[in-house]
A protein has these predicted regions:
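Structural signature of alpha-solenoid helical repeat junctions
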Residues: 102, 139-146, 183-185, 225, ...
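Eukaryotic all-alpha helical interaction scaffolds
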Residues: 114, 134-138, 177-178, 197, ...
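Flexible helix-coil transition and linker loops at the boundaries of alpha-helical arrays
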Residues: 94-99, 132-146, 176-184, 217-223, ...
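DNA major-groove recognition helix of helix-turn-helix/homeodomain DNA-binding modules
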Residues: 63, 67-84, 397-402
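A short, Lys/Arg-rich alpha-helix, primarily the initiator
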Residues: 2-35
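Tandem amphipathic alpha-helical repeat scaffolds
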Residues: 105-120, 146-162, 185-201, 224-241, ...
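Short alpha-helical DNA-recognition segment
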Residues: 33-59
């Protein structure tokens, strides 16, 4: 059964009433298209489904859940994925994290701090509440720009949570008014889109969008945004296995980050540079750089980056045939990535290399446990990691052979 169907049915079974968040999302989609309730009913019929306007009204009010078949029809009407609906319901758990009584700017500042701490659900809740306030009261200074800025931040938080379809939708919504937006906001939106498309494996589109963001940032003298665009271009090059060129881009980014006093991204880029050196066969230098970045991430309290650095060290030792060191590093990463907020992509990465090592050592019990973890984590990943693609290919081969 598809993950979206499982999630929606689980939600329907766990509550007698519907989802207020899903209802609000459906209403935003309908209003965004300029559709009346009756018009949605007509479009549903054109898509081969049946949703009368009274049903949709109940869905929007959070009175009841749509069936999975109804969600399929609504997804076609509004040109979104069923997965997006599932993700919206999943995010309902973030409602309890919303702060009360704060101004939008303070909420956004809290969200930014939560992002750096790796608390992505908390960050999402702050941004979402700030966006609600800005929507309900346009008397705030520069309300339109503030709304777009917050929407971009919200999209970045969604992408960190693995909700790529929802994140992309928020960014495309932000860019609808690109003619009236400042170069800073347009560049930020394109850069966020670029990273989402890199996560999805569309490296050509990602490169085009990052280049556009870089040109806008340079023209406006926005060094921090230019650094982020260079970092994304380095990422695209690394994913294309052009590691030497990626290092050059990363170093340009670090130079700009340091002039801006941006420590968090500097640490992230240093991890990536170390990873590139390992990929080039320069193990000693790569490990040195990653360990140096790891120490700074730990000191600064950047839990996500610390977990990432341990994972990259684990992979480096695995490729060098140093199994004990690899396992030790991956365990350190698991401890950080498993709580208080889980990072499924890092946990999957770690489980993949545990699975490979168990197979190499002829340990069927450990291999089976790691494989079970991979299967459990796979359903929560939209991001197209090389390890995800290798695992999917293995599963498909086994299915074909069976």
């Amino acid at each position: 059964m598809p993950r979206g169907e499982v999630d929606m049915e689980a939600q329907a079974e766990s509550a007698l009433k519907g989802s207020v968040r899903l209802g609000s999302y459906l209403r935003r989609l309908r209003v965004g298209y300029g559709y009346s309730l009756r018009r949605v009913e007509e479009r549903a019929k054109a898509e081969g489904g049946e949703i009368d306007n009274s049903q949709l009204s109940r869905y929007e009010k959070g009175i009841c859940y749509p069936s999975f078949d109804k969600l399929r029809v609504l997804a076609s009407v509004f040109n979104v994925s069923v997965q997006a609906f599932s993700d919206v319901v999943d995010l309902e758990a973030c409602e309890v994290l919303k702060a009360q009584g704060a101004e939008p700017k303070a909420l956004v500042d809290e969200g930014n701090a939560a992002m750096k701490a790796g608390a992505y659900r908390q960050a999402f809740a702050y941004y979402d509440f700030a966006l609600d306030q800005l929507h309900s009261d346009d008397s705030f200074p520069n309300a339109q720009d503030a709304m777009t800025q917050t929407r971009i931040n919200l999209a970045v938080a969604l992408s960190r949570l693995g909700k790529l379809a929802l994140a992309e939708q928020e960014l495309r919504h932000a860019l609808r008014a690109s003619n009236t937006l400042s170069p800073t906001l347009v560049a930020r939106a394109f850069l966020a889109l670029s990273n989402i498309h890199a996560d999805q494996g569309d490296l050509l589109l990602s490169e085009v969008e990052a280049d556009k963001a870089l040109n806008l940032a340079k023209a406006a003298g926005l060094n921090l945004l230019a650094a982020r665009a260079l970092q994304t271009l380095g990422r695209v090059l690394a994913q294309n296995k052009e590691h030497s060129a990626a290092i050059d881009r990363y170093r340009e980014a670090v130079t700009l980050y340091e002039t801006c006093g941006e420590q968090f991204e500097t640490v992230r880029v240093r991890i990536n540079v170390g990873d590139c050196y390992v990929a080039l066969g320069k193990m000693k230098e790569g490990v040195r750089l990653i360990r140096s970045a790891l120490a700074d991430a730990r000191t600064a309290g950047y839990r996500r980056l610390e977990a990432q650095a341990w994972s990259n060290l684990g992979e480096a030792h695995f490729r060098a045939g140093e199994t004990d060191q690899a396992q030790s590093c991956l365990r350190q990463s698991d401890a950080l990535a498993g709580s208080p907020e889980k990072y499924p992509d890092i946990l999957f990465f770690n489980a993949y290399y545990e699975w490979k090592m168990a197979g190499n050592q002829g340990n069927p019990t450990r291999e089976k446990i790691a494989f079970g973890r991979l299967k459990a984590l796979r359903s929560s990943l939209e991001r197209r990691l090389p390890e995800v693609e290798a695992f999917d290919a293995f599963v498909e081969r086994r299915r074909s052979d069976g």
